[in-house]
């Protein structure tokens, strides 16, 4: 079983913020396939569905971002999901808007949601899709910046990025060859 995790903060006020881009990608996949996160357990909203012939566990942690691992690790354990079948989608300040970077493994890179997942799983050896949101340029603090909603102009770019990232996830589910998916989907979304 594959496990697709989108990171974000719960609540209406966080919708369409930079920090919630992981939720947006998972929501895009779910909406296009008419799935819903209809279950809750271990601090996570989730569903198990069949997609491209593969059983898939979709998770959105119902903790705040910094505690995401408290939802992800117990659900993966409960459903006996191997860490090699996990993909986490999240915002990345070190990538410009429009950039998507798929990685087989790696550090948290300063992202507190990823730090929590790595700590709870006891490893950083899992796949991730880093979605560029850029850095603040006008002296705004990083916390204020990532919790700020995208502008209308930014949303034009980010809608393409969301769709691109969702297709990358679906491609991995279908093929299980993450190296091929990386070659196809890494880079700038136009």
UniProtKB/Swiss-Prot annotation:
PROSITE patterns linked: PEPT_TRNA_HYDROL_1, PEPT_TRNA_HYDROL_2
- Positions binding tRNA in this chain are 14, 64, 66, 112
Task: Identify the Pfam families for this entry.
Answer: Pept_tRNA_hydro (PF01195)
On the tree of life, the source organism's domain of life is Bacteria
Q: Could you tell me the keywords of this UniProt record? A: Cytoplasm, Hydrolase, RNA-binding, tRNA-binding
* Catalytic residues (positions): 19
The places in or outside the cell where this protein is found are: Cytoplasm
Q: Does the keyword Cell cycle apply?
A: no
Name the Enzyme Commission number(s) assigned to this protein.
Answer: 3.1.1.29
Q: Site annotated as Stabilizes the basic form of H active site to accept a proton: where?
A: 91
Has keyword Hydrolase? Answer: yes
Check the record and name the InterPro entries matching this protein.
Answer: Pept_tRNA_hydro, Pept_tRNA_hydro_CS, Pept_tRNA_hydro_sf
- The protein's site described by Discriminates between blocked and unblocked aminoacyl-tRNA is found at 9
Self-association and partners:
Monomer.
Q: Which HAMAP family match?
A: Pept_tRNA_hydro_bact
Purpose of the protein: Hydrolyzes ribosome-free peptidyl-tRNAs (with 1 or more amino acids incorporated), which drop off the ribosome during protein synthesis, or as a result of ribosome stalling.
Instruction: State the similarity comment.
Output: Belongs to the PTH family.
| Name of the molecule in the record | Peptidyl-tRNA hydrolase
Gene (UniProt):
pth
């Amino acid at each position: 079983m594959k496990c697709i995790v989108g990171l974000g903060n719960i609540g209406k006020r966080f919708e369409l913020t930079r920090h919630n881009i992981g939720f947006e990608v998972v929501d895009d996949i779910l909406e296009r396939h008419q799935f819903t996160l209809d279950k809750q357990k271990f601090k996570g909203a989730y569903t198990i569905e069949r997609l491209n012939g593969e059983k898939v566990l979709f998770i959105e942690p119902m903790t705040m971002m910094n505690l995401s691992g408290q939802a992800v690790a117990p659900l993966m354990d409960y459903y006996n999901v191997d860490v090699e079948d996990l993909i986490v989608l999240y915002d990345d300040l070190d990538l410009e808007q429009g950039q998507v970077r798929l990685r087989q493994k790696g550090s948290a890179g300063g992202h507190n949601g990823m730090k929590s997942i790595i700590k709870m799983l006891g490893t950083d050896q899992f796949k991730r899709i880093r979605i560029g949101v850029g850095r603040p340029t006008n002296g705004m603090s990083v916390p204020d910046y990532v919790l700020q909603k995208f502008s209308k102009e930014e949303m034009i770019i980010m809608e393409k990025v969301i769709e691109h990232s969702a297709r990358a996830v679906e491609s991995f589910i279908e093929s299980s060859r993450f190296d091929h998916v990386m070659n196809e989907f890494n880079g700038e979304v136009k």
